[in-house]
């Protein structure tokens, strides 16, 4: 995508160097019309993305390379058909559903629009709009995983009150749709300084039996695997014992390695 750096081969080499068993590539899906925004690949670049991931598979045999897409859930005429069309162009291992836009031209995690978070009423309005779309994303039946659930907290803005009012419908939707949800470590690198999603959300996931994926959301090779020990420790503390992996859009549960979590303790000494 146009807000990342490096080539898939570099990411795969980093994963291999860290001793990771596999790495998944999940570039943002191109929009049906070029010019939709300035941070995703163009339609014409989609075949190049597929080839570069295939190249990483060939050139870095020490790590399993999975092919995915992060799919912005956009509502409107033809949106679902476009997702289905692109998803048939390769043998994807997984599709991740995400929400960035709550209105045309307004991607809420874009620093360009930070001035719109001007007060408590605006924060509540943005969060409410986001989660309504996110619930529909989870229930759409299009995806295997849903990404960074509480993304609206990226800049540190959260509404007052019990946030479980937003979390509960999403956890139920994920359970009903048989989706996995990620711990996304990128949140620790943002203003919110907290993983996506919050611990309370993770606890609700575990209680409901929703599977977990751990993701670094790397946009540079050096971010591959970032804070994985910390995420593994958190997952184990909440009660998770396995994470989900995907191959050919089929899910497999793999035990969390407790020695990975121990590395988080070592780094804090």
What are these regions (language model features)?
Residues 30-33, 102, 213:
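Conserved radical SAM core fold
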Residues 35, 116-119, 183, 213:
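A short, mixed-charge helix-start or loop-turn motif at secondary-structure junctions
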Residues 43-177, 259-268:
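Extended substrate/RNA-proximal surfaces in nucleic-acid metabolism proteins
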Residues 4-11, 19, 153, 158-269:
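Charged catalytic cores and adjacent phosphate/nucleic-acid-binding surfaces used
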Residues 1-77, 84, 145, 152-165, ...:
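An N-terminally biased module of ancient metal coordination in phosphate/nucleic-acid-related enzymes
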Residues 23-25, 65-69, 95-97, 145-147, ...:
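Hydrophobic faces of well-ordered beta-strands that scaffold small-molecule active sites
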Residues 16, 88, 138-139, 206, ...:
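Non-catalytic positions within long, well-ordered alpha-helices that form the structural scaffold/packing
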């Amino acid at each position: 995508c146009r807000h990342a750096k490096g080539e898939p081969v570099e990411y795969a080499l980093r994963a291999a160097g860290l001793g990771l068993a596999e790495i998944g590539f999940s570039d943002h899906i191109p929009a049906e019309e070029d010019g939709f925004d300035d941070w995703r690949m163009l339609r014409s670049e989609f075949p190049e993305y597929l080839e570069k991931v295939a190249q990483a598979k060939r050139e870095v045999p020490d790590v399993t390379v999975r092919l995915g897409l992060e799919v912005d859930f956009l509502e409107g005429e033809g949106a679902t058909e476009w997702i289905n069309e692109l998803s048939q162009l390769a043998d994807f291992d997984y599709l991740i559903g995400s929400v960035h836009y709550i209105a045309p031209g307004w991607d809420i995690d874009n620093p360009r629009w930070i001035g719109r978070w001007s007060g408590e009423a605006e924060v509540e309005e943005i969060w409410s709009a986001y989660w309504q779309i996110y619930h529909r994303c989870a229930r759409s039946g299009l995806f295997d995983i849903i990404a960074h659930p509480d993304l609206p907290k990226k800049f540190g803005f959260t509404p007052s009150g019990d946030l479980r009012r937003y979390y509960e419908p999403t956890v139920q939707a994920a359970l009903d749709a048989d989706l996995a949800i990620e711990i996304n470590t990128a949140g620790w690198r943002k203003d919110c300084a907290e993983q996506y999603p919050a611990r309370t959300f993770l606890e609700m996931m575990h209680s409901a039996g929703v599977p977990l994926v751990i993701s670094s959301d790397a946009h540079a090779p050096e971010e591959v695997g970032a804070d994985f020990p910390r995420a593994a420790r958190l997952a184990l503390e909440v009660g998770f014992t396995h994470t989900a992996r995907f191959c050919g859009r089929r899910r497999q549960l793999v035990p969390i390695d407790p020695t990975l979590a121990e590395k988080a303790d070592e780094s804090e000494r």
